[in-house]
């Protein structure tokens, strides 16, 4: 074994040891990491606060980058399940991959947050003791938002130190790796490379995170909605070739859309 290889292995061991120490430190401070129940009935104040105050900010400032299957770190913030699932270091597109990767389609390839943890996804919300201090200190989103407040977007005509290219190197720290991430990239708080949140937006999100990041359960489908769904599913699932072609054409034009049944209520419910 040559000296260069020994040096590389020592450095790798050092970083691995640092991450392990950080994890142990969080465990000592706030207890072990466990998947938490974060949804509440839509009638509760917590769920109402998420729907009325938090979700519009997330949709306006975060979802623009974190909505697709190939979002940075596979973090999809467009749904309750995506937020709770968290992020992954695995690349969606990897040109050097020689074998097929296990797909990570939300709602398809795992049903619970724990199953996503087993598949390699790490939390972006605090999963240790649910205290206000722990929710901010051991929650990745909270830390990244605070980082942006400490290091606002530089006042530059052309930003320096930000790589927006499609093939840029992916950086997806866990909460245990966050301190090193901030030291290495102080200006990489969230929203990445974008203007800071307004004071109101920032305090709204931090209040939500501090109180456990409670989100809403899904509203049950009504009998009228289910009847409409059944009608369209019957239409789109005829087995003859002509209807198969028609259904495929319709699907290819609608699968990215949010659909609603306009005749059922004045205020549409999107699916």
What are these regions (language model features)?
Residues 1-3:
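N-terminal secretory signal peptides that target proteins for export/translocation
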